[in-house]
From Swiss-Prot:
Enzyme Commission number(s) of this protein: 2.1.1.166
Transferase in keyword set: yes
Record protein name field: Ribosomal RNA large subunit methyltransferase E
Natural source organism: Acinetobacter baylyi (strain ATCC 33305 / BD413 / ADP1)
Record's signal peptide: none
Length: 216
């Protein structure tokens, strides 16, 4: 039997987070507009500024669950495009989105994604991946940077010459080094902190445009 969680059972910090979440205008907007998560508005702002995703494109969405970015990508690419989504967590099906559940850190998942693509060139890789946090920044930060590096490595393997890359990364230890990897890999780099990113959050999104070479 499921146990209902009441305010009395939550810690003080959890209650504060819950209040903030429920009062969040982007949470309310997502519920009203039918998006699965407030994160939708981060990608929507990026898309509005840079028009990265276009009809007919092939998109790979890493760290996709619960699926708000895939919702947007699917609508933008239309019936002639392809969206492949992957996450370690389960995700409810979406029209015209192919979903692969698995841990992207495992080579098997990496290879399965390549098999699904079957040699098809990808136009854009988008990654909202983040590890489960421990609360210890010295542990969490390297884990997140590692996921970013895996996403970049994958992008290098599947993107065409004009390919694009959008990745969430936390500022902190390893950020400058990873940013340089993206600079070395794309003709243009943009750094964006969308309005939907909470002010206290260290997250930013790096946007690479025009793949120029593989990582050395």
């Amino acid at each position: 039997m499921a146990t209902r969680i009441t305010n009395q059972k939550l810690s003080k910090s959890s209650r504060a987070w819950m209040r903030e979440h429920l009062d969040d205008p982007f949470v309310k907007k997502a519920q009203k507009e039918g998006y699965r998560a407030r994160a939708a508005y981060k990608l929507l702002e990026i898309q509005e500024k840079y028009r990265l995703i276009k009809p007919g494109m092939t998109v790979v969405d890493l760290g996709a669950a619960p699926g708000s970015w895939s919702q947007i990508a699917g609508k933008l690419v239309g019936s002639k495009g392809l969206v492949i989504a992957s996450d370690i967590l389960a995700m409810d099906t979406l029209p015209d989105v192919t979903f692969l559940q698995g841990d992207f850190r495992e080579e098997e998942v990496f290879e399965k994604l390549l098999n699904i693509l079957n040699g098809r060139t990808v136009d854009i890789v988008i990654s909202d991946m983040a590890p489960n946090t421990s609360g210890n920044r010295a542990v969490d930060q390297p884990r997140q940077i590692y996921l970013c590096e895996l996403a970049l490595d994958f992008a290098q393997k599947v993107l065409g010459p004009d390919g694009q890359f959008v990745v969430k990364v936390f500022q902190g230890s390893g950020f400058d080094e990873f940013r340089k990897q993206v600079v070395d890999s794309f003709d243009v780099l943009k750094t964006v902190k969308p309005a939907a990113s909470r002010a206290r959050s260290k997250e930013v999104f790096l946007i690479g445009q025009g793949r120029k070479k593989a990582l050395q």
